[in-house]
Amino acid sequence: MVSIGMVFSAGGAKGDPFHSGVIAAIAEHTGFDSRDAELVVGTSAGSFTATALRAGLSPIDAEARHLGRELSAEGTAIVERIVTPYAEPEVKRSLLPSAPRMTLNAMLPPWKIDPARFAYGLLPDGKRSGASIAARIDELLPDGWPKRPTWIVAVRTNDGRRIVFGRDDVTGTVGQATQASSAIPAFYTPVRIGDRSYVDGALHSSTNADLVATLGFDLVIVSSVKTATADARSWRSDPERAWFSNKLDNELAEIRSTGTPVIVIEPDDTQLALLASGERVDACAAGRLAAERVLATSDGAGLRSIVESTG
């Protein structure tokens, strides 16, 4: 039986639309339905895509939802499970550093300072609550955690450690995990689960693709909106994207060192221009175009071959 793992990156409001365009294009051009992935890994916005797939929303409906098109009867029934309105109410917060321990840990041996964790620990907590995210995802998945492997990445505030909900021995509903994974530092309040607090998994990496390195998949597909193709990166004009791209390169090297092939779908200059508009429809189009560009190469032929071998 052929096994495919899928990784969905962080990306803010552009993330889920981009990923939806990617998976819709993959479905149309190769016949692979991302709902059939053996494992889905979601970081921040990518956790929305991962949970929607595990709820049964098809790639075509996922894209249609962002484009304002009519969904299938099945897709409509799934989306209508959500009854909680989306809201981001402001809450009182302290202006003291949110996680000084994390800042300290970022400077400890082996003396390779992690600038993201270092900076976050000095910032105050965010002042917006993302509680409606947890409620909505729990409504989308009323039976709780999906039966098929679903990993959602967050960062624990007290020590800066990466935590993988759905894999690690930690508590929390799938909705709480998604809220934690997308709790953007200094914007959203950290998410308290049990006696620990968590924030956005992108604080560690926008992709966290290295999590699948040793799992022995026949193929890994990474949809990454926060990185860019090598010719579209610039430390001068967009250091954050260059930073995340460098992190992803290292993760890909780790995966490939095990002999696992990887398909990476990320924006080039054309798609970056679309993403710059901030519109969901443009982010969706960017994801579709990025996927179609990659699928036109030998990577696409390889994926089609794998899909056909399972048919």
Give names to the regions the model predicted.
Residues 1-43, 48-311:
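Patatin-like phospholipase
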